[in-house]
Amino acid sequence: MSAADMARKNSLINRQLEKEKIDSKKMLKILLLGGPECGKSTIFKQMKIIHMNGFSDLDYVNFRYLIYSNIMQSMDQLLEAAEFFHFPPDDSPSIRRALNHYKSYKVRYSTSEVELNRELADSLSKLYNAEFIKSVLNRKNELKLLDSAVYFLDDIDRISAHEYKPTEMDVLRARVPTTGITEIEFPFKQASLRMVDVGGQRSEQRKWIHCFDNVNGVLFIAAISGYNLYDEDEENRKDDGTPTKTNRLRYSMELFKRIANHQCFSKKTAMILFLNKIDIFKEKIGKYPLTTCFKNYKGVNAFEPACKYVTDRFSRLVSGDIQHEKPLYTHITNATDTRNIDRVFDSCMDVIFKISMEKVGFM
């Protein structure tokens, strides 16, 4: 190879390396973090709808069976709650037949194998409309019930139809716990975004540290609606061996405190908090006082003052030194509302672009 050819080759290599360097500067990494059942995966699905043309036909087939599974899980939760509240099944032959059919189906098939045929759908519909289940639903905000339970069971006829294909709202409502690490990449304005969704279950959280390098923005999702709910903490037990109970919102606060003050996130990493599930919170706050979670709360049990109080409590968890370098940005969200998430995410990206400007050097 002549010297001229070698020079041309080196020039091409250098230009390619420079292009890759520029491209890497334009890639922004966004981390989605939060505890179990906070709505994190729903935000992730919204990004696919808003920025990636939604879902494939195969995705919709998989979501169809996931929705069937969610319906069975919801009915299990309602029947367990009826036992807990001591609400006996209606004394009716049709309800007894429906309950027996449902239980025998559960013996034959696992939740993941469900085919929502007409007979099973009829049994589910009869149970859902029975008086003892209505009594449970009157206290649904006290239960650990799938957020989508009423949504799907209300529409059991549509969902059990042979030609059923999930709508986008069905997909957003479908619940599956995130396990492992899932990534998507999509263009946004003058940059490319890599969004990383990390499993929120307690057993998954030890994996989070592996995703903390070169993060431009953290979206931490906390379900504000969990303020009156408690989960069993299998890792911490009482003297008698029974698990301790942890308030869901308090647990999110502890998690957020660790993340927001973590040394891996420099002053150039935007920290953004989504107080999510405000639709459920609005339903609850007039019935279940905020003092369930915050004993020192002195305000009225109304949406706006309660939201402001929770926002302030989260803000106080971030150290003064960090807040001096970069403020905490908080948004009140409903993850199943596409317009709300589109608007909020646009605002978040303005913040991330601004804070990342010095780091990525392309604005």
From Swiss-Prot:
Role noted for this protein: Guanine nucleotide-binding proteins (G proteins) are involved as modulators or transducers in various transmembrane signaling systems. Mediates the transduction of food and serotonin signals, which modulates the avoidance response to the odorant octanol. Has a role in lifespan to promote longevity.
Residues of the G-alpha domain: 26-363
Binding site for Mg(2+): 41, 178
GO molecular-function term, one example from the UniProt record: GTPase activity
Region described as G1 motif: 29-42
Name of the protein in question: Guanine nucleotide-binding protein alpha-11 subunit
Coiled-coil segments: none
Reported tissue expression: Expressed in ADL and ASH neurons.
Region (G5 motif), start-end ranges: 333-338
Species lineage: Eukaryota, Metazoa, Ecdysozoa, Nematoda, Chromadorea
Phenotype of null mutants: Slow to respond to octanol.
GO biological process, one term: serotonin receptor signaling pathway
Stretch list, region G2 motif: 170-178
Cross-referenced Pfam families: G-alpha
InterPro entries linked to this entry: Gprotein_alpha_su, GproteinA_insert, P-loop_NTPase
This protein's GO CC annotations: cytoplasm; heterotrimeric G-protein complex
Subunit structure as annotated in this protein's UniProt entry: G proteins are composed of 3 units; alpha, beta and gamma. The alpha chain contains the guanine nucleotide binding site.
Key words, A-Z: GTP-binding, Magnesium, Metal-binding, Nucleotide-binding, Transducer
Entry similarity comment: Belongs to the G-alpha family.
Region (G4 motif) residue spans: 272-279
UniProt region (G3 motif), positions on chain: 193-202
Positions annotated to bind GTP: 34-41, 172-178, 197-201, 276-279, 335
